Regions:
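Non-catalytic C-terminal accessory region of glycerolipid acyltransferases
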Residues: 40, 65, 101-227
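Catalytic core of membrane glycerolipid acyltransferases/transacylases, capturing the structured
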Residues: 42-101, 113, 127-130
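A conditional alpha-helix N-cap/helix-loop micro-motif detector
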Residues: 28-30, 79, 97-100, 138-139, ...
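Short, flexible loop segments at the rims of nucleotide/cofactor-binding pockets, characterized by
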Residues: 22-28, 75, 92-98, 135-136, ...
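Short amphipathic alpha-helical segments and helix-helix/interface helices
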Residues: 36-37, 60, 86-87, 107-108, ...
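Membrane-anchoring hydrophobic helices of lipid-metabolizing enzymes
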Residues: 10-50, 86, 94
């Protein structure tokens, strides 16, 4: 079923007919945009916390059409042709791209300007991580979003997108996740990353057939994570 759904949402992502928000609204409904607005009003930037559920890249297009100045933070794909196609798609609709781990100063500048970053944390990659719980098992989870939020005061706004039974897209934006700040930096990194992971798990549980189960999410063992 995942493969069939992937074909359905890929056709939406690759649509060349998108010219405006009204075009997007023909097949995509946004829920909770007011939560982004409330977080953005604080003036310290917004980190969209999201995951590889559904047509996840369409979220950046949606927010760009809503007037949000957004950069997607991610790791390049191994296939250069597919990577170029994806970047062209993002740029065409107003979102920019920042390679994970290559320009941290730019990430901070974007947040200080009051702009938004979109960061996916549901994959086990070779970046700074902490072991936290995910579906009852220890999982190496990237801490970039956690560190940025703790250092800059940016609001962390969770979101995800999914395809319903009628093949309509639905993007859900939720209230800001409050950060824990006890003064113990390492403990706070772990606690906040766990809170973020809890949201991701909830999103995946809502639509498990639309998550990227082919990824080796639990491949890194405790003590092997990049620190």
């Amino acid at each position: 079923r995942h493969t069939r759904l992937q074909g359905d949402w890929s056709s939406d992502v690759c649509s060349s007919d998108l010219k405006s928000l009204s075009d997007l609204r023909k097949f995509l409904t946004t829920h909770g945009f007011e939560h982004f607005q409330a977080a953005h009003a604080k003036g310290k930037g917004v980190i969209f916390l999201t995951c590889h559920v559904g047509a996840f890249d369409m979220q950046s297009t949606n927010m760009a059409f809503h007037g949000v100045k957004l950069s997607v933070v991610g790791t390049p794909m191994k296939d250069e042709r597919l990577n170029a196609l994806l970047q062209n798609y993002r740029n065409a609709f107003g979102a920019s791209y920042i390679e994970r781990g290559k320009d941290n100063i730019k990430l901070i500048k974007e947040l200080k300007l009051g702009n938004a970053l979109a960061i996916l944390i549901d994959q086990d990659t070779k970046v700074k991580s902490r072991i936290v719980n995910f579906f009852g098992m220890p999982a190496a989870t990237p801490i970039g979003a956690t560190i940025l939020a703790m250092k800059t005061g940016a609001a962390v706004v969770p979101c995800y997108i999914h395809l319903n039974d009628k093949l309509d897209q639905h993007m859900h934006i939720y209230p800001e996740i409050p950060l824990v700040n006890t003064g113990n930096e390492e403990a706070d990194i772990v606690t906040n990353t766990q809170k973020f992971n809890d949201f991701i798990e909830t999103a995946v549980r809502q639509h498990p057939e639309q998550w990227v189960w082919m990824h080796e999410r639990w491949k890194t063992k405790v003590g092997e994570e990049v620190r």
